[in-house]
Structures are given as structure tokens and as C-alpha cells.
């Protein structure tokens, strides 16, 4: 039987909230303010969740972790990814690989890129690449008002799964 191969895309954007811890890529960055949100505000983890859910045909992050679901209030991006991964494996699906790009001025990702890739790959049991870019001062990320992330994921399962 041939494997079923699916690709998903996810995005997330949050405003920055002064004084809030900055969780990004499942890492705590002490040198920047974090993002507002129902959870920890980790836009990279959220974009990855959306990409995985999309590829798996399991809806989206709002469906699974919606603000109307109090049990997910304050949840970490790492725990969200673990939950999505668990949902997928229960359906016979696995992550082939994933990529996430953070869009914003701060925090600087480069010095912790390898660490982020190790953490994310460990959670998902597959290679995860991390990149970052700025918007050259344009838009809410360029003005430092928020952070955004875009992610892709390749999901593999038995034929007919997902």
C-alpha cells in the first residue's frame, strides 16, 4: 500500500503585550515582550499546529483550542503541539517534516535557531526547520506591534488515512 502524503499551511498573528513573557518556538525569550493571547501567545507553535491540522484534515487551531474552551486557557505552545501530534498519531498519521518562519523584529531568532529546531523536532518526532524575517518596517510586525508566523507541514499516513 502506498503512503498518503499531505501538505498543510498555517499562519498566526498576535499583538505584543508589554510585560508579558515572550514564548516563541516553544522557547522563553527573556529579552523581549511576549504576545497577547488565550494561550501563551507562541505564534510559531500556533502556526505549526494549524499547518499540521490542515495537512491531517483535522480542522484548525480555533476548532481544537478555541477561546471558548477554558481548559486551554494559558496552555503552552509545546503542549498544543503535543496534543495535535497525539491526535494525528491516533489516526495513523505522522509528521514527515515541518518548517516555520517567524516574522518580526524581536526577539532575534538566529542565536537560538538550533535550539528551537531541536525542541520542535523533539516534540513532533520529525525534522522542523526554523527561519525568521522582518518586513523592513512595514505593517504591524515592522512597527514592532506584533509577531507573525507561517508554517508548512508534510504529513504521512497509510492510504486512506487523513
Swiss-Prot record:
GO biological process assignments: isopentenyl diphosphate biosynthetic process, methylerythritol 4-phosphate pathway; terpenoid biosynthetic process
Pfam family membership, one: YgbB
Domain of life according to the entry: Bacteria
EC number per UniProt: 4.6.1.12
SUPFAM superfamilies in UniProt: IpsF-like (SSF69765)
Gene Ontology molecular function: any one: metal ion binding
InterPro entries in UniProt: MECDP_synthase, MECDP_synthase_CS, MECDP_synthase_sf
Cofactor: binding details: Binds 1 divalent metal cation per subunit.
UniProt keyword terms in alphabetical order: Isoprene biosynthesis, Lyase, Metal-binding
Metabolic or biological pathway: Isoprenoid biosynthesis; isopentenyl diphosphate biosynthesis via DXP pathway; isopentenyl diphosphate from 1-deoxy-D-xylulose 5-phosphate: step 4/6
Catalytic activity: 4-CDP-2-C-methyl-D-erythritol 2-phosphate = 2-C-methyl-D-erythritol 2,4-cyclic diphosphate + CMP
Swiss-Prot/TrEMBL site (Transition state stabilizer) positions: 38, 134
Residues the record lists as binding a divalent metal cation: 12, 14, 46
Annotated binding of 4-CDP-2-C-methyl-D-erythritol 2-phosphate, by residue: 12-14, 38-39, 60-62, 133-136, 143
Required cofactor(s): a divalent metal cation
Function: Involved in the biosynthesis of isopentenyl diphosphate (IPP) and dimethylallyl diphosphate (DMAPP), two major building blocks of isoprenoid compounds. Catalyzes the conversion of 4-diphosphocytidyl-2-C-methyl-D-erythritol 2-phosphate (CDP-ME2P) to 2-C-methyl-D-erythritol 2,4-cyclodiphosphate (ME-CPP) with a corresponding release of cytidine 5-monophosphate (CMP).
Subunit structure: Homotrimer.
PANTHER family: 2-C-METHYL-D-ERYTHRITOL 2,4-CYCLODIPHOSPHATE SYNTHASE, CHLOROPLASTIC
Homology family: Belongs to the IspF family.
Listed name of the protein: 2-C-methyl-D-erythritol 2,4-cyclodiphosphate synthase
UniProt gene name: ispF
Amino acid at each position: 500500500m502506498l503512503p498518503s502524503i499531505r501538505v498543510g499551511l498555517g499562519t498566526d498573528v498576535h499583538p505584543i503585550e508589554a510585560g508579558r513573557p515572550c514564548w516563541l518556538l516553544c522557547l522563553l525569550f527573556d529579552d523581549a515582550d511576549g504576545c497577547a493571547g488565550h494561550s501563551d501567545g507562541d505564534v510559531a507553535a500556533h502556526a505549526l499546529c494549524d499547518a499540521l491540522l490542515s495537512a491531517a484534515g483535522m480542522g484548525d487551531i480555533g476548532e481544537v483550542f478555541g477561546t471558548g474552551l477554558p481548559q486551554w486557557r494559558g496552555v503552552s505552545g509545546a503542549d498544543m503541539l503535543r496534543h495535535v501530534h497525539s491526535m494525528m498519531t491516533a489516526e495513523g498519521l505522522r509528521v514527515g517534516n515541518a518548517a516555520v518562519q517567524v516574522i518580526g523584529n524581536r526577539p532575534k531568532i538566529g542565536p537560538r535557531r538550533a535550539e528551537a529546531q531541536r525542541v520542535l523536532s523533539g516534540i513532533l518526532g520529525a525534522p522542523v526547520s526554523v527561519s525568521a524575517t522582518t518586513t523592513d518596517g512595514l505593517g504591524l510586525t515592522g512597527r514592532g506591534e506584533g509577531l507573525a508566523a507561517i508554517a508548512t507541514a508534510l504529513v504521512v499516513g497509510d492510504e486512506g488515512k487523513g
